[in-house]
Each structure stands twice: as C-alpha cells, then as structure tokens.
UniProtKB/Swiss-Prot annotation:
The keyword Transport applies. One of its GO terms (molecular function) is xanthine transmembrane transporter activity. Keywords: Cell membrane, Membrane, Transmembrane, Transmembrane helix, Transport. One of its GO terms (cellular component) is plasma membrane. This is Putative purine permease CPE0397. It is found in: Cell membrane. It is a multi-pass membrane protein. The gene is cpx. Belongs to the nucleobase:cation symporter-2 (NCS2) (TC 2.A.40) family. It comes from Clostridium perfringens (strain 13 / Type A).
Length: 452
C-alpha cells in the first residue's frame, strides 16, 4: 500500500484510487475524462496529417487509430499489467511534443517512417523506466510542487484560447464566445460547489452537455463532420506499412525524453490530488506503461502515447480518484476508435464550452501545486528555485520563439514550458545550497513554531 500524504495536503475524496464504482457511475465519470482529453487526442494526428498533406482516408484512419491507441494505453496505465502501469486515474494520448519530429520524419519517410520511429523510439522510454528509482531522489516536494503548479499554469492559456473560440478562429474573442465560456464556467462552478452527491461529481460533464445544447441554436456547432463520418471503422495492424530508420528514431528520442519528464510530473500531480504518495516503483511502472502504450499505438497506426495533464484537475473537482474510472474511459475510447460518427459528435464540442470547464480544471491543477509548496519552508533558496523555474517555464510558454535559434534537438527538449521548468527546478535543487543566514532563520522558525 502507498502511504497517505500529510493531512494538510489531503483532498477530501469521495472515491479513492482503488475504490470501485457501479457501472453507470464509471461510465459517467469516464465520459468526463474523455471530454477533457478528446480534443488533445485528435488534434495532434490532425495537425500532423494536415501538415504532411495526407488525404482524407489516411487522415481519418490516423485519427481513429489515435483514439484506439489512447484507449489501449489508458487501460494499461490505469489497470496495470504485471509491472506495467502506475495503477492511477491517468488518461493517455499523444502530446504536442511529438508533432515536430513526426512532421520532420513524415516529410521524408511518410506515415510508415513515423510509425517505425514510434515503435523503436518507445524502447528508449522502456529502458529509461528501469533507471527511475535513482532519479526519484531529485524530486522532493519543492520540485514536484513547482512542476504541478507549472502544469496548471502552462495549460491556462490553452483554456483561455478555447474560451475565445480557439486560436486562429475568425471570431476569436467574440462576445458570443466569451459569454458561452463564462456561462459554462459559472454553471460548472455552482454545481461543483453547491451540488450534492453525483450532481457535484458530474459537474464538468453536466456543464459540457448544457453548454453544447446552448451552442446549437447559436450556430456554434457544425454537424457536417458527423454527417460525413462513417458508423464503423476498423483500424488494422500496420495498415499503412512501417519503415525503420535510425535517423528517424534519433529524431524521436528527445521527444520521448521530454515525455518521460512530463509523465513523472503528471504522476506526482495525480498522487497529490489522489491522497497517495507516488513512490519510485509506481513512477517507474508508469513510465514503462508510456513506452508499452506507445509501441501499441504504433502498431495500430498512431503516434506515441504519454500521460495527459489536463485530466488531473478533474480528480480535484469531482473528488473521484478511482483508477477504475480511468479504465472505463479507456474502454470507451477503444469503442470510439471503431465508431467515427460518435467520435465526431464529441469532437464537435465548441471551443468556448471546453474553455469554460478548462479554466476551472487547469486552475485547480495549479492550485494543487501551490498547496504542496505551501507545506515546505520558503527559505531564500527555495524561493529562488521556485521563482526561476516558474519564470523559465512560463517564459517559454508565453514566448516560444525565444528558443527559435537553438539547435533542433535542444529546442525540442525546451519547447515545453513544463519540461523547461522541471529541468530548471531539478538542476537548481541539486546545485543551490542553503546559505548560513537562511539556515539560521530556518532554525529560529522551527524553535518559534515549537514554542507556540
């Protein structure tokens, strides 16, 4: 059993990590996770397919395969198979970290090259998982709290873009979009705070459904993709072939390294919101699951899979940390991988609706990190580590062009604000030592606390 966190950091959960629920509740809570993650699951293959000029048949197959691969990887991560899987409520999908290398490889070797690099590159993450234990000593609460806060803060701009209608949309920041987003935010907030039982726990799902319905008469829902989508689709193993190339694999290695760092941070964050201490064995099992899930994803024709940070906030808001809910979400994703028409309905959720719930979800993740940091002694050294790590992580997030002139391999590693902030926190925590003045202040603080 994993030991529980300190009481002052605990979340008042309705269902713990290993608590099972009846089927209707698992489906209901599982759908909430799917709605939060679905946009991220399909947008990466869509961006890759569009950038490489794939035809509609290949694009549709790639998206269906990504949904199926995400479901399989989620089931393995949440349920666990032997030593594989962290066995927590973790949703899996393809991260934007893999977009650049996939386009680079695909422009030369096509989709078979991407699939080959995905499968062989996953072995790097599998190997890396066996070295997690000695690395975990570099992740004290100071580092994990900073990383968790960064996960939420770096995702908030995404939710704001959603609320405005989506980055690059013709009606960006229109009053209609903002009104819908604020309406959904208020509905979700009221249900979560004042609702009882299932109403409170299902507040995100209810908010999305209500927002979706409101958007239909406003003309914000396009049902064309639903009409055009087929009812059934059966992704095939290596349907478009596979090409193994050493250079292609090397292009994916930095992205897999960044994904590993992100997974460690996500699992730690899930631990914080689930009232468990995610130990090194569980983290190693989670990273191993990333590698296995990516290999499976490649086999069914999708890109690598890694943990999705946007689902962490759902645990805090719904007070449901059950991994069985995540398993159900994985099962539903697998089913959706075979039902393009149903998947298209979910894909059609308007951006302002996602923005309304996203602001609440991602803000909750940031607050969880701040709560962790509030339980450590904020000495001058610790404040410096938090400040610089946050500054660099948010700086890269808000001004991504600042690393434009770096070599491609280095640029890939620091392209994510989460990875940049995490690396900074790890290095600073290892290098910076407490000054004599800070240590003296800390001793005085301890004595005063004991005296009181």
């Amino acid at each position: 059993m994993e030991k529980q966190n300190l009481k002052n950091t605990e979340v008042n959960l309705i269902y713990g990590v290993d608590d099972d629920l009846d089927l209707p509740k698992k489906v209901l809570f599982g759908l909430q996770h799917i709605f939060a993650a679905f946009g991220g699951i399909i947008v990466v293959p869509l961006v890759i397919a569009t950038s490489l000029g794939f035809d509609s048949k290949v694009t549709t197959a790639l998206i269906s395969a990504s949904i199926l691969g995400s479901g399989l990887a989620t089931i393995i991560q949440a349920k666990g198979v032997g030593k594989v899987g962290a066995r927590v409520a973790c949703i899996m999908g393809t991260d934007f970290t893999f977009v650049s290398p996939a386009i680079s490889v695909g422009s030369v070797l096509g989709l078979p090259g991407i699939i080959g690099a995905t499968i062989l590159g996953s072995l790097f993450e599998v190997i890396l998982s066996f070295f997690i234990k000695p690395l975990m000593k570099f992740f004290p609460p100071l580092v994990t709290g900073t990383v968790v806060a960064l996960i939420g803060l770096t995702l908030l701009p995404v939710s704001i873009d959603w609320a405005a209608g989506g980055a690059g949309s013709a009606n960006y920041a229109s009053l209609e979009n903002l009104a819908v987003a604020m309406f959904v935010l208020v509905i979700t907030l009221l249900l979560n705070n004042y609702g009882k039982g299932m109403i409170s726990s299902a507040s995100i799902l209810i908010g999305i459904v209500v927002g979706y319905i409101v958007c239909i008469p406003l003309g914000l829902v396009d049902f064309t993709p639903v009409k055009e989508a087929s009812w059934l689709s059966f992704p095939k193993i290596l349907e478009f072939g596979v090409t193994f190339d050493a250079k292609a694999v090397m292009a994916f290695i930095p992205a897999y390294f960044v994904a590993t760092i992100g997974t460690v941070g996500c699992l730690k964050a899930i631990g914080e919101t689930s009232n468990i201490d995610i130990g090194d064995k569980r983290v190693a099992a989670g990273v191993l699951s990333d590698g296995v899930g990516s290999a499976l994803g490649g086999l069914v024709g999708s890109c690598p899979n890694t943990s999705f940070s946007q689902n962490i906030g759902i645990i805090s808001l719904t007070k449901v940390a059950s991994r069985h809910v995540a398993v159900m979400a994985g099962i539903l994703l697998v089913i959706l991988g075979f039902l393009p028409k149903v998947a298209a309905i979910i894909t059609g959720i308007p951006n302002p609706v996602l923005g309304g719930v996203g602001i609440m979800m991602f803000g909750t993740v940031a607050a969880a990190g701040i709560r962790t940091l509030s339980n450590i002694k904020l000495t001058e050294r610790n404040l410096l580590i938090i400040a610089i790590s946050m500054g660099l992580g948010l700086g890269v997030t808000f001004r991504p062009d600042v690393i434009h002139n770096l070599p491609e391999a280095i640029r890939m590693i620091f392209s994510s604000g989460i990875s940049t902030g995490t690396i900074a926190a790890l290095i600073l925590n290892a290098v910076l030592k407490e000054s004599p003045t800070s240590m003296e202040f800390e001793n005085m603080y301890d004595e005063e606390k004991k005296a009181s």
